């Protein structure tokens, strides 16, 4: 894809602050390490700013939200906004939780670099009809035409922010560009935390100076292409999970991996 340039080798071992849930915490930490950066996970309000101030990117994931974690999230997001620290917000569960949806809308005032979610979550957030249950997307919510138009309008309201919408076809929308990407495999939906991992990888690429649009395209494509290489081998679910990290660490050695991205970028 001509609009993207290879981010590897990683130029500096950036510190990525992930405020995420306990379920996917280990996967995110190892995924960040596999790309050559360093993870830290701190969500106690008493120390959250100490770690955020040392970081080169911030990833906020709303899984397992609590009152204390919400306080820490708001503190970190405020600092990121004031210091121009790249920030990714993953709108997990906004289809079900009014508390999470309200928090995400408040976080928009802190101007995240990337707002991420699955098709159902983003449709819910922008006020479109959706069928999402829990934290999962519905197959009924994969229509992108109406969503694309609304996201273009939101990008004008929140200039500088990109939307990363995951699904069978991944949609990335910024003020001036739209990407529709088609790599991936259904096996990624069978293990928990892969969606969260996309957000963490987006933060990694943001820490290397990529724009929100570029970082989103790179992150979702990198994970999807790594997974495609595993599926070719054929294996059980636990082995597939194990091999995800292997391929994340190996794919960056392939100087031509960008050539395997399937999709289009529109100006």
From Swiss-Prot:
Catalysed reactions listed for this entry: 5-(2-hydroxyethyl)-4-methylthiazole + ATP = 4-methyl-5-(2-phosphooxyethyl)-thiazole + ADP + H(+)
Top enzyme class: transferase
Cofactor(s) in the UniProt record: Mg(2+)
UniProt-annotated binding residues for substrate: 41, 193
Pathway the protein acts in: Cofactor biosynthesis; thiamine diphosphate biosynthesis; 4-methyl-5-(2-phosphoethyl)-thiazole from 5-(2-hydroxyethyl)-4-methylthiazole: step 1/1
Keyword Transferase: yes
E.C. no: 2.7.1.50
Keyword Metal-binding: yes
Family: Belongs to the Thz kinase family.
Function: Catalyzes the phosphorylation of the hydroxyl group of 4-methyl-5-beta-hydroxyethylthiazole (THZ).
Name of the protein this chain belongs to: Hydroxyethylthiazole kinase 2
Gene (UniProt): thiM2
């Amino acid at each position: 894809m001509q609009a993207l340039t290879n981010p590897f080798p990683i130029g500096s071992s950036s510190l990525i602050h992930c405020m995420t849930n306990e379920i996917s915490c280990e996967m995110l930490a190892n995924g960040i390490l596999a790309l050559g950066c360093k993870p830290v996970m701190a969500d106690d309000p008493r120390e959250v700013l100490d770690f955020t101030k040392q970081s080169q990117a911030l990833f906020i994931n709303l899984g397992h939200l609590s009152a204390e974690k919400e306080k820490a999230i708001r503190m970190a997001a405020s600092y990121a906004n004031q210091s121009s620290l790249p920030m990714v917000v993953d709108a997990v569960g906004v289809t079900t939780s009014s508390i999470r949806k309200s928090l995400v809308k408040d976080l928009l005032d802190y101007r995240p670099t990337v707002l991420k979610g699955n098709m159902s979550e983003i449709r819910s957030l922008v006020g479109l009809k959706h069928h999402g249950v829990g934290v999962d997307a519905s197959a009924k919510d994969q229509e992108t035409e109406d969503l694309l138009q609304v996201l273009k309008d939101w990008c004008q309201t929140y200039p500088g922010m990109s939307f990363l919408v995951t699904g069978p076809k991944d949609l990335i929308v910024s003020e001036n560009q739209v990407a529709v990407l088609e790599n991936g495999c259904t096996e990624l939906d069978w293990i928990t935390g892969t969606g969260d991992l996309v957000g963490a990888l987006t933060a990694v690429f943001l820490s290397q100076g990529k724009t929100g649009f570029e970082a989103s395209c790179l992150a979702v494509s990198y994970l999807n292409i790594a997974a495609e290489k595993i599926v070719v081998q054929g294996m059980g679910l636990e082995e597939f999970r194990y091999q995800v990290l292997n391929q994340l660490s190996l794919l960056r050695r392939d100087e031509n991996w960008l050539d395997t991205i399937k999709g289009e970028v529109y100006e």
